[in-house]
Amino acid sequence: MIHSFARASLLLSCATIAFPALAETAPTAAASTESAAAESGPQIIVTGDVLYSNQINALKSPTPIIDVPQSLSITTADQIVRQGFDSIGDIVLYTPGVTNSQGEGNRDSVVFRGVRSTADFFVDGVRDDVQYYRGLYNLEQVEILRGPNALLFGRGGTGGILNRVTKKGVVGENFVGYRGSVDTFGAFDIWADVNLATSENSALRINAAYEDLNNHRDFFDGEQIGINPTFRAELGAATTIDLSYEYVDHERFVDRGIPTGADGTPVRAFKRITFGDPDNNLTTFTAHVLRGTVQHAFSDSLKGNLTASWGDYDKAYSNFFTTGFDPATNVVAIDGYVDTTRRKNLVLSGNLIGEFATGGINHVLIVGGEFIDTSNNNDRFNAVFDTAVADGRRADVEFFAATRPLALRGGVGTLADGRTTNVAFSALNDDTEADLTIFSAYLQDEIKLAEWLRVVVGARFDSFDITVLDNRNGAVRTRTDDKVSPRLGLILKPQPNLSIYTSYSESFLPRSGEQFSDINPPNDALDPDTFSNLEAGVKWDIYPGLALTGAVFEIEQNSPQVSDANPDTLDVINSKIRGFEAQLQGQVTDWWFLSAGYSYLDGKQQSRTGPTGLRVRELPEHMFSIWNNFQATDRLGLGLGLTAQDDSFADNSNTATLPSYARIDLAAFYDVSDNVRVQVNVENLFDELYFPNAHTANEVTVGAPLNARFTITGRF
């Protein structure tokens, strides 16, 4: 690992020194960002040290970033385009303290400070917990907040959350933006952004995208369609209404990676083999989401907002994947299943934000509530191999030679012993209907005791009520969890551009899990998992436009488990994750934008009797990323980046290892005119073979080799 980091860091350092020599005086990226923000209206933007909005956002109040006692990172739409990001996973790679999990080839999955999540996603501050791949076509920016914090986000958020801020109508303007790109794998996309001023006080904005998917793996293809019309109306100076509808339609091949070998590392010889059925490894996802927000200023010191969101989601995925590999015989064990989810979500949330003073002490008080009503129907059918049944073995596993391609297609395969097998998804494993109702109320006070001292104190009450019907046997199980989650923060400000803070926050996850598919015994008798975050950090605005942040933290998970048939006998399984994060981001000079992040993570699993000696899975000890934008001339810009991770374990038993890696990326962009830009992004410049993430020890993702993306963007 040391050699990989040293080699990559040396290359990057040399290039970082060399590129500025090309630079000439040019308009700054900060100016460009501010100009773009002005054109796109009052969205959540970064201007100096303030994250502000007259809309709901992840922080729920207009709070200077420097005064937030929690680690957070923001990726703007401009950064998304310049760095060539085309997925949430790309953004995560360049964010400290977080990394990607595999998501079984059918969903986003982020590891926040060592805690894996497929549900801690939000859109404009509203929960978006269905499992799918989220697009970037309609975003102003992406916010990643780290550390458990149920006060603002409710259940989950056990290691952090990711919030997408969408584009809204811009009153008084007419414009059309577009993007088209194609990469060396053959994938391409087309984005459109159209804003129409429908009156002096209203605007209609339509964002749409079509993406044709392809990559370096056999059989992979797919498409993504997104359409998001939004309407904004300003009803006088004090009231704004935003309405939106989003239609999402995804279809893609499911690739769950390759197995590990006898040495516990991914089998490099399998880098081109897809262990699945080209006709049956498939996921589809359709969503219809309606959202409306009303914001009103009752006075200069009291504002309120109310959001209603309704979503209808339909997802299915079928897949075959490896569960084991025998190096002596070159034989893999193949398992499979098909899973469907039909979900409807209603979310109502509201906040009152007041600013007032009591006895010379200033307050920013947030009072809020949330109601969630969810119905979820989930079923799973396991694969049945007729040869396994005939042999009297487990029906959903068979053994194939590790060949390219795997001898399985259309449900018919040739086994390692030469026999023909037929497989169908016919064994019912689960069929549940869940109804979930959540009532929440929260209160937070940001107290300014003096110019140099601020305190944040608050708490949230959640009542989580779930009923699950098991259609296999008609059993109905219910559970209600009432939880209070506190948040405390202390901020010292020796000077206006410097904050030193400490904070404590909690969150919880009911035993029905992130996707609440069941509460079968013994889970119906167990309390929720609880998570706490103790953090201390510093935020320093070195000068306007350049900020340095750092934090040390400890996350503790408490997960009660039944150790035998008696639910009264529990074995409490804990994990403790300690770490350090640092980030430097902003305009170093008028021609150099820098975003750099580092994290150190150390996590151990614990039982009731103490530490087990095992490390938490998917927890690289060291992670580092850096991205530079250099404005070489008035029209030419260059980008250079590095993302690197230490080795980590793919499983909790610490038997499978993901090797360390370092990947270097490049970019060049040229402004053909004031309204048209062409650019090229090169990923994995030195064609490193790497394995960035996994789902289990036998499902390891193969990183993409050297590739390039060519993009044209414009606006008129």
What is each of the regions a protein language model found here?
Residues 137-140, 151-229, 235-239, 288, ...:
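Outer-membrane beta-barrel translocator/receptor signature
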Residues 40-173, 536:
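Acidic, small-polar-rich N-terminal luminal/periplasmic segments of exported/outer-membrane proteins
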Residues 295-309, 313-319, 493, 500-501, ...:
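Membrane-embedded beta-barrel scaffold of Gram-negative outer-membrane proteins
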Residues 234, 343, 362-366, 370-374, ...:
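Structural signature of Gram-negative outer-membrane beta-barrels, strongest in the C-terminal barrel
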Residues 211-215, 227-297, 310-343, 389-429, ...:
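Acidic/polar loop-and-plug regions of large Gram-negative outer-membrane beta-barrel proteins
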Residues 451, 551-556, 571-653, 686, ...:
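Gram-negative outer-membrane beta-barrel transporters
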Residues 201-204, 238-241, 301-304, 360, ...:
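Repeated loop/turn-to-beta-strand initiation elements of outer-membrane beta-barrel proteins
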Residues 644-651, 669-716:
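C-terminal beta-signal and adjacent terminal beta-strands/loops
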